Amino acid sequence: MPPAEVFLSHASEDSPMPQNLATTLTRHGVPVFFSPINITGAQQWQNEILGALQRCDWFVVILSPNAINSMWVKREVAYALQDRRYEDRIVPLKYIDCPLESLQWLTLFQIINFAADFKSGCRELLRVWGIGLREELLP
């Protein structure tokens, strides 16, 4: 079943991959909260992020060295792990190889590998929701 809305947790330094993923999901009919798009000028971004975490029904985190060192990614992951709505609805994506041993919570989840191939990663992620990849919708 497709999600109502996906929270996309990422490190801003990892652009353009998070942007490309948000675009791909949106083009496949999956609503995404992606802070660079959904938070506009004059908004209090901390409140917007908290509101999105409370509203979304799936949590996708893009793992990279930047992400595992990001205070905000750590906070977002901690929130998702404690919120029962996200039980069985947290999807970690490995974008860039990084030391995952420090992330004890990861042992609970199957990681989707985006490090080798963006298209294959998108195919596997969309399959989680029963959606087939349409290559013409890739950025």
Segment roles from a protein language model:
Residues 59-60:
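Hydrophobic acceptor-binding patch used for acceptor engagement in glycosyltransferases
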Residues 56:
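An anion/phosphate-binding loop that grips the pyrophosphate of nucleotide cofactors and donors
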Residues 1-28, 91-139:
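C-terminal interaction surface of TIR/SEFIR-family domains
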Residues 29-39:
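Conserved RecA-like helicase motor-core motifs
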Residues 44-49:
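Short acidic active-site motifs
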